[in-house]
């Protein structure tokens, strides 16, 4: 089997908050008549530049044409050579490698007539406990709207949430107090996510303030600036709660292991460059005796299905994970969206080959956008994933 062509389709899909996220749907064609699909998820992140899709397609074709899709390690090395790792969270090269690698996995599994999770080594479970995100309070008046989100999602079966914190601690504290008062033990807040906004000392003070409202807290996420390994270590010594950090390069993961800076690796294929790299990162965590949580950039169903296959194949996921992306959008580009039930993400049925997801060409056309340009998006809209222009 040889790769014969590549398609890249940019789509822009609004979240329920009004913020439009742009993604790229990947199709890889072969001489066997099989097509693999993937997703370069959520290009709507800083830094404030966009990728030219025509140039990207030509560059990727120069790597992929004529290749055997099963040569995953060879292709991934060539992808990394051309789209290198950096020490930055939202490196767009990782998004690109992720979309291609996921499509290759879909293609290979389809050829073998098995599911992607079987191609990854089989399943240890069929579902993953996940949480719904509560986005960061900038103003106290946002507390009530976020409480409405909890009410709505609890009715839909989501009983675990993660809270983005650090911009307005008074509002964060008010929200937690009211959640505890209204919902009691019916709701858990699994993590406080600082998103690298504060230095570790300020994060430590915030943690002491917010953990008065421990509602099943499992971890503290990203409580220091990016790549501040010493800060993470210092904070880890001073809090009783496990510290979690995203993995965005193997060098960065190596440094966190060397410094013993964290307890839990937050691993997401989009940030580390695909299923192949995510699996490596999970194995490195296991060797280092660290737990893993499955992260997210709020993918659509194609990207989330890939994550579900990965999560159900790993043995060291012992905490509530994050992939609830499809629930945040007003639409999708597939005929069969991923399944959520009672707060769990279910992997597609293993009797369905590949990722188990089928594109809907009419929806792909409906949400198609000409490019990945930014329009008039502000920094705070990017950070807080809102269409609200108030700052």
From Swiss-Prot:
The lineage of its organism: Bacteria, Bacillati, Bacillota, Bacilli, Bacillales. Belongs to the mandelate racemase/muconate lactonizing enzyme family. Coiled coil: none annotated. It comes from the Bacteria. Its cofactor is Mg(2+). Substrate binds at residues 15, 89, 296, 385. Keywords: Lyase, Magnesium, Metal-binding. Changing residue 90 to F: 3550-fold reduction in catalytic efficiency. Its EC number is 4.2.1.158. Binds 2 magnesium ions per subunit. This is Galactarate dehydratase (D-threo-forming). It catalyses: galactarate = (2S,3R)-dihydroxy-5-oxohexanedioate + H2O. One of its GO terms (molecular function) is lyase activity. The enzyme product is the enantiomer of the product obtained in the galactarate dehydratase reaction catalyzed by STM3697; the enzymes thus differ in their regiochemistry of dehydration. The active site is at 90 (proton donor), 164 (proton acceptor).
């Amino acid at each position: 089997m040889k790769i014969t062509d590549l398609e890249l389709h940019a789509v822009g899909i609004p979240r329920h908050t009004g913020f439009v996220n742009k993604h790229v749907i990947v199709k890889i064609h072969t001489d066997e008549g099989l097509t693999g699909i993937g997703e370069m998820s959520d290009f709507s992140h800083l830094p404030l530049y966009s990728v030219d899709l025509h140039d990207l397609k030509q560059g990727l074709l120069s790597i992929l044409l004529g290749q055997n899709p099963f040569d995953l390690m060879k292709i991934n090395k060539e992808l990394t050579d051309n789209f290198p790792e950096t020490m930055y969270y939202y490196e767009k090269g990782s998004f690109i490698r992720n979309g291609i690698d996921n499509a290759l996995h879909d293609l290979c599994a389809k050829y073998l007539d098995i599911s992607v999770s079987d191609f990854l080594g089989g399943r240890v479970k069929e579902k993953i406990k996940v949480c719904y995100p509560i986005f960061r309070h900038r103003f106290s008046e946002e507390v009530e709207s976020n409480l409405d989100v909890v009410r709505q999602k609890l009715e839909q079966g989501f009983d675990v949430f993660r809270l983005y914190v650090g911009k307005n601690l008074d509002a964060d504290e008010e929200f937690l107090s009211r959640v505890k008062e209204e919902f009691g033990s019916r709701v858990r807040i699994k993590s406080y996510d600082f998103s690298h906004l504060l230095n570790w000392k300020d994060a430590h003070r915030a943690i002491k303030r917010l953990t008065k409202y421990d509602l099943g807290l499992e971890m503290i996420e990203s409580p220091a600036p990016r790549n501040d390994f010493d800060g993470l270590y210092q904070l880890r010594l001073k809090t009783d709660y496990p510290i979690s950090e995203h993995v965005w390069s193997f060098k960065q993961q190596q440094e966190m292991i060397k410094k013993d800076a964290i307890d839990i690796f937050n691993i997401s294929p989009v940030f580390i460059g695909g299923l192949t790299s995510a699996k490596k990162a999970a194995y490195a965590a296991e060797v280092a005796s660290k737990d893993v949580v499955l992260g997210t950039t709020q993918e659509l169903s194609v990207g989330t299905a890939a994550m579900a296959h990965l999560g159900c194949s790993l043995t060291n996921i012992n905490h509530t994970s994050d992939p609830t992306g499809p629930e945040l959008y007003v639409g999708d580009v597939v005929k069969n969206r991923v399944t959520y039930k009672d707060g769990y993400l279910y992997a597609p049925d293993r009797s369905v080959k590949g990722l188990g997801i089928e594109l809907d060409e009419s929806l792909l056309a409906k949400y198609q956008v000409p490019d990945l340009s930014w329009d008039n998006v502000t920094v705070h809209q990017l950070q807080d994933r809102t269409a609200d222009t108030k700052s």
